[in-house]
């Protein structure tokens, strides 16, 4: 009888929610919007990478951290925030010169997230668009699907098909952003 009770307790306490009510319910490598960067690396290991036109936010790349799904993780933090609250999580899965598998992985992730967010976020398929670069001969494309919450927070799934290696690697990016960070990134950062 004790074993059955213990099993039932484990079953009901270890279940994860099948749907997310809020972007903070969604984790990437155990990291959520609203967490502190200090939960994942020590303060002395934080290297701030600022954006070209505004220093309101910066990103921190998690280096020498064991990751299960992503090849790389970046966290966005508001400048001068002593609690290091995360406003954005960006994970990358690289597919070296393999656009087909990049698109396939993007579709798999979008399918999973569509179920996870089905009652709480609008799905917007942006389709394929040209990647804007200074290289006139560049034919790189990006394919993006967004999930927008009523709060304005968002999750983006993007396959970058980079034809010019100087622009970056072909791969899937999954990013979660608060409304404030997303708006800033689109209007002030670059």
Feature locations, PLM:
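Sec-dependent N-terminal signal peptides
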Residues: 4-18
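Non-cytosolic coordination micro-motifs
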Residues: 21-64, 87-190
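Compositionally biased P/S/T/G-rich terminal and signal peptide-adjacent segments
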Residues: 61-85
